[in-house]
Amino acid sequence: MAGIGFELKKLFQKRGLAATAKAYGYAGVICTGPMLLGIVLLVGIAFICDHTGATRHNRELLNCMITYTLLASLTVTSFFSMVVTRYIADMLYEERHEAVLSSFWGSTALLLVVGGIMYGIFLLFSGINLIDQFLCLEFFGELIVTWNAMSYLTAIKDYKGILISFITAVAVSLLVGFLLILIGIPHVEALMIAVTIGYGIMLLWDVTLLYR
């Protein structure tokens, strides 16, 4: 979060209650965006399930799949976050911006391979069907890239753009999930597809910001 921290520091230097509240608000939403999106999606999914006749088993299965995947991705990326943050700070200090982007893809590939193997083994013994295993693994991969990208975002000023990406991701996920259920796709698969689409939107947005 080095780059985010540098820019948020400028907001905190501004005086006034409104400026301070704005800085804290941006810091909270930006740094916890993926997890916040997960919580909102879980609430939205529960609402959709209640109004579309989903069984209790399906609701609990969805909650477990999403929660376990979130926790697994956070656990894997946490082992690298401190090293990544220190490296970003050093490269920015030395004004070697090209090294930051190249290391992003290198660290992302490493996290995807190591994390994907570990989580893939877990899914094999989880007891869920093959389609759900694939959706969970895809969701896990998106989360890995998203968490890592959040550590690499540098010199960000378009905070409103980031917030819009969060809101758009939630809206699209819930809308797509509802539509997929309406056309007859089972609840678990429909809503997992919707969640991967939602986080996919945020992933693409974050990676795009890295190249601005």
Describe the role of every protein-language-model region.
Residues 1-41, 60-64:
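N-terminal membrane topogenesis motif
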Residues 44-70:
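Interfacial/gating helices of multi-pass transporter permease domains
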Residues 67-72, 125-153, 163:
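Alpha-helical transmembrane segments of multi-pass membrane proteins
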